[in-house]
Amino acid sequence: NTNIVLASHFGVKGNGIPCGEQCVAAINYIMINGGTLLFPPGEINWGKIRGNFNVKNGPNFKLLGTPGKTVFTFDNIDPIKINKLWGHSEPALITIGSNSTISSEYTSSFIMESIKIDYSRQKNQGGPTYNTMNNGAHPTPYSDGTLAIHIMYADSPILKDIEISNVYGSGICIWKCTDAIIQNVTTYNVSANQVLSADGKNESVDHFGYSIWSGASANTKISNCKAFNYRVYSCDPKLKSPHNNEQYDGKICGYIGIYCEYSPIQGNKNIESIHYEWLSDENTDKRGYAKVINCFVRGYTFGFKSESLMYIHFDNCKAIYNYIGFSIQASALIENCYINGLTIDYERCPQQGIESQRGGVCFSWWSGENNLHEQYLLNSYIESRKYQCISLGKGTVTIQHNTLRIYESAALIKTVTSFELAKVKISENRLIIDNIKPITSPEHIRITNTQKTDFSENYLYNLSNAPCELNISNGTLKNNLFNGNFKYISTTDYCVIDGNTFSDIKNRTTPEFIFLSSKNTHFSHNIIHIHHIEKIKDIIFLSKVTNFSFIKNNIIVDKNYFSENTIENSLLKTFGE
């Protein structure tokens, strides 16, 4: 094929002998002339050379390795002092493109395929040693590490069948690109996270150390990618977080697995996305859109993340052993996903601001109060032992057709911030409480600071002896089936509890409904099963309640049926003023 150029013609060899300059010459040639550059099998050692390629508006090209056999390796370069323009402390291994000054200049469409990258020779491996404690949580004060592949302002770049291993830093960055495709990429121990400053006194909430990041790019698609991280901090156990006094030693060292952030107008607002007319007026919708499909993340502070004017569609993804499985700080649709925190729940996170937000899925908005963000969780499965399956913060949230299963001291759904949510809709879910422990403040479902809550047609099954507590903000609790030991607590301005069924055949407990300083509460058309006639007075408690109505509820004591007319007066118990 006349369009195929052999990299070996430029002196590139797969024998481990440094040939970085030859690699640079070969790639520059193919970017200028077009075609496919075929790399030989074996270890292609770039030495201390770092590839920085910046050919604008050239022909399309392809960088192709021998499948499963071409490995790019690099000799160590020591960290440098971080500057204000870029957070990594070592130059990127391979950079294609650059920040353009005009929209019409960009890197043409290209494919990078069937190439492995290994940086085992990197000395900055993360985690301090005992003789470098003055440098904080890493061997040097400037230890965000490196970036394996940096793609900037490119038209339709495709990274396919890429494997990246042993990089202290980050894997792939797509910056201000259009229609990027990242497919079948696997990373092993590609991670970093300098949570502690060099003086050991300050902490960073936001840093580097990711597998894949799409930043300020239009229409990115990430599919069939996997990020495995087993890197942990290795340091003096006495070194602890100034924030929560948790030790760093042995804890996850990795920030984010896969995430997308920033709208395409981030940075220079005068530079439009390639082929897109993206208005930069402050009053227009500036959101970027991306898809993350069939991906897996293990061993990061955040498994997946959406942030800062992004709308991401996550489909059929799995998050295992991450402090937070999915962190949704903007808009997102999560569907058909699996989040498992059963093992990592036994570890507290030493990074500032994370512990209070923890959950399988964290719906929030850290950058400010913004209820315009739409957040959806559909047809997914979440398990937890200690933290909530779902954390609520801000925005408009829909949780539908999911299975949430908790053990020990975990919770199902909780509000974790003081910001106000516009609307929370929780419907048609299976909520399973399995072997929980009695604790001081159970509150397995707590939805507060919400303008309107719709909790409807859910099936809640409490398999334990301990009671499950529900505290739901203003709105409706309608047509749900509660099986097990339940206690409902209300402090709302308005609430409609209608058409629900409460029973506990296994433990024969009596449900409790407690209304404290509540207003405009309507309790109607519910079916309540109790198993002890003497408990009939212990069902509903009222304190400082105004406008409470009790209409057409059915109470069943074993096989005896009581209508509301015969027991209404004895059923309602008032205390306080």
Stretch-by-stretch model annotation:
Residues 37, 61-65, 94, 315-317, ...:
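Well-ordered beta-strand segments characteristic of repetitive beta-sheet solenoids
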Residues 49-53, 77-103, 125-150, 166-173, ...:
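Extracellular beta-strand/beta-solenoid scaffold signature
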Residues 115, 162, 185, 225, ...:
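Consensus "Asn ladder" position of solenoid repeat domains
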Residues 20, 24-62, 66-87, 117, ...:
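N-terminal extracellular ligand-recognition/capping segment immediately after the signal peptide
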Residues 38, 44-52, 70-76, 92-96, ...:
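Beta-strand-rich extracellular passenger or scaffold domains
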Residues 12, 115, 119-122, 166-168, ...:
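Glycine-centered low-complexity coil/loop motifs and glycine-rich tracts
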Residues 1-24:
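Right-handed parallel beta-helix/beta-solenoid
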Residues 57-59, 108, 154-158, 176-181, ...:
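Short "repeat-start/strand-capping" segments in structured domains, especially the N-termini
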